From Swiss-Prot:
Residues 1-20 form the signal peptide. The gene is Mlac1. Its EC number is 1.10.3.-. SUPFAM superfamilies: Cupredoxins. This is Laccase 1. Cu cation 2 binds at H80, H122, H582. Its cofactor is Cu cation. It comes from Metarhizium anisopliae (strain ARSEF 549). Induction: Expressed during isotropic growth (swelling) but not during polarized growth (germ tubes and hyphae). Expressed exclusively in the later stages of conidiation and in blastospores when M.anisopliae is living as a saprophyte. During infection processes, is also expressed by appressoria on the cuticle surface and hyphal bodies inside the insect haemocoel. Cu cation 1 binds at H78, H509.
Length: 612
């Protein structure tokens, strides 16, 4: 090797190692009392704070996170949106990639910081997301994003400014909050025989209040047509904005169980008690970055579907689920539990204090949430600006509705990947039909016709280490197996199971890989293949510019109309990956399935420290 070639090799190795630095983090998980909305309860703290610390890394960093469980209950940490390529043992899913971290023990997660973008981490043990273990992750990219920003502005100064703003964004972790712990909340449903999903607050960065604007006000804030289309005439919400718990349209059925609404404690469904506390304040500086600011939103909600807007400010949505998209300008956007959004805002309004409106937009409850975006130096000024959303998340004008992002279906969700990235056309190599819905009780949910995914499924013998443990057992109905290098279609059907003809949305998240949503339509799936469906209903498919994400929404079905969705992905990351609804009540009730991707190339060289 020549001296020059040797020098080039040394330089290349230097820059590779510079990019791939090792970053060590420590997370200490404790159980303490707190009052994020002004009302005390016990919750999870991470390193003494709630929500958990924001973690910022560079693409391809070698990450080592040591988690100390200092609670009296089990825990794991899932790195939501990270692909865990070649490190499935660090995904953080009990029963699939590890055993739960028991009280007093620790676990070391090791993985590459990949892919770049806006992600988050959270607990994955039972319903403990309700208790507060969640935080933002930002992986700064190595690649050039000029082509992304130039779709927003052709000005070179703007392009440079947006790159700087995206490198150092504001983080907004949005969560819903209940006065009850996860164990208490679930017990209310099982004791009463009713699925209960009434909340108390929307929090931003762990801060919020309990609002009690009155029953008449909340009734007037219902989404137009919701009661007429979905509920009996005259249905009224409570003074917390919640629908009556014993409505058949809410609970489904009939089920062979006893309904005991009298066992729902006071203040769960009604009996609102207001509390003044504080809302999050985001201070922005229009003198920096040519007046551009980037905001990373994490929907760490457990039930709610969040809408967000900033009074008088439009924004460019440029990233969803850690995937860059061709930017589009909106005044409000809806995001489902589990999703992450990144937006770019031009600070071109009169300096002042502007309300950020972040209500629950779903049909589950009328519930407002707020934060403040304050221009630097205007912290003590009165609020200014024009509202785009009402307290309950309704657009304040037809023009607002026209310029809002709704992820309901193919014809309204036009957020195509940047740079272009589309799946293989035609038939996939494998197709799996999954029928979603309730079985046996209002709180029992399945992803495969009848099988309920237990909260402790394979906890003692995780499938990464025992991939054949469920064969020849009934539990094999909770497992799908795919081959490495194959294209897979997951066909999800809702509103066809007995007793579940009216179905709320499900927020479906797949670990280990993102999926393209290539199809969405009404009716019962009765096609022999996806290719046949494409030929018969081409208007319901998009294989040229479909979105690419790790969390997708299914349809809100009213009055027995069935819906289906088709998601396509490529298998190149062998391991056991959970596919589940990100509504905590639904996952707790059984809405999950284990996908063993690449069983013919199963990981063999698992580090000894992870061996079970």
């Amino acid at each position: 090797m020549s001296r020059f070639a040797r020098l080039l090799l040394i330089v290349a190795l230097f820059f590779t190692s510079a990019w791939a630095k090792t970053v060590k983090e420590t997370l200490r998980i404790t159980w303490e009392e707190g009052a994020p909305n002004g009302q005390a309860r016990e919750l999870i703290y991470t390193n003494g704070q709630f929500p958990s610390p924001t973690l910022v890394w560079d693409e391809d960093d070698d990450i080592e996170v040591t988690v100390y469980n200092e609670m009296a209950k089990n825990v794991t940490v899932h790195w939501h949106g990270l692909d865990q390529k070649d490190t499935p043992w660090s995904d953080g899913t009990p029963g699939l990639s590890q055993r739960p971290i028991q009280p007093g023990n620790k676990f070391v997660y090791r993985f590459k910081a990949s892919p770049p973008g806006n992600h988050w981490y959270h607990s994955h043990e039972k319903m403990s997301l309700v208790d507060g273990l969640y935080g933002a992750i930002h992986i700064r990219p190595k690649g050039d994003r000029t082509g992304l920003w130039s779709q927003i502005s052709q000005d070179k100064d703007d392009i440079k400014a947006m790159e700087n703003a995206a490198y150092d964004p504001e983080y907004l972790v949005v969560s819903d909050w209940s006065q009850y712990t996860s164990e208490e909340y679930w017990k209310i449903s099982t004791d009463s025989g009713l699925l209960v999903f009434c909340l108390d607050s929307i929090l931003v960065n762990g801060k919020g209040e309990v609002y009690c604007p009155g029953q008449k006000f909340l009734q007037a804030e219902l989404a137009p047509g919701l009661v007429e289309d979905a509920f009996p005439p005259g249905t009224e919400v409570s003074d917390k904005g919640c629908f009556p718990a014993d409505l058949d349209q809410v609970q489904g059925g009939p089920w062979n169980i006893t309904k005991r609404p009298d066992l729902i404690p006071p203040r769960v469904q009604e009996g609102c008690v207001a509390s003044r506390h504080e809302n999050a304040t985001i201070v922005v500086d229009p003198s920096k970055n040519n007046g551009w600011v980037s905001m990373h939103f994490v929907a760490a909600a457990t039930i709610a579907q969040i809408t967000f807007s900033v009074d008088s400010h439009e924004f460019w949505l440029y990233e969803i689920d850690g995937n860059y998209v061709n930017p589009r300008k909106f005044v409000s956007a809806v995001m489902s539990a589990g999703e992450t959004f990144s937006v770019m805002i031009k600070l071109d309004q009169e300096p002042g204090k502007y309300t950020m409106r972040i209500p629950n937009s779903g049909a589950s409850q009328v519930l407002g949430g707020f934060a403040e975006m304050v221009y630097k130096g205007c912290e003590h000024e009165e609020k200014a600006g024009k509202a785009y959303l009402s307290y309950g998340g309704n657009p304040t004008s037809p023009d607002v509705e026209k310029n809002s992002f709704f992820p309901w279906q193919l014809d309204t969700d036009h957020m195509s990947p940047w740079p272009p990235n589309k799946p293989r056309p035609g038939n996939a190599d494998e197709e799996h039909l999954l029928v979603l819905g309730r079985v046996g009780a209002p709180y029992n949910y399945t992803m495969n016709t009848k099988y309920l995914y237990p909260v402790d499924f394979q906890n003692d013998d995780p499938l990464l280490f025992y991939p054949n443990a469920t064969r020849d057992t009934e539990n094999d109905g909770l497992v799908l197996r795919t081959k490495n290098g194959s294209w897979v279609d997951l066909i999800l059907q809702v509103s066809t199971l007995p007793g579940d003809t009216s179905s709320f949305e499900h927020f479906m998240h797949k670990h280990g890989s993102k999926t393209w949503r290539i199809g969405f339509g009404t009716g019962v799936w009765n096609y022999t293949s996806v290719e046949e469906a494409i030929q018969e209903r081409p208007q319901d498919f998009n294989l040229e510019t479909p979105g690419l994400r790790d969390t997708w929404i299914t349809a809100f079905s009213i009055g027995g109309e069935a819906y289906w969705s088709v998601f396509r992905y490529f298998v190149d990351n062998p391991g056991p990956w959970l596919f589940h609804c990100h509504i905590e009540l639904h996952l707790m009730g059984g809405m999950g399935i284990a996908i063993l991707d690449g069983v013919d190339a199963w990981p063999e060289h698992i580090p000894e420290e992870y061996q079970c």
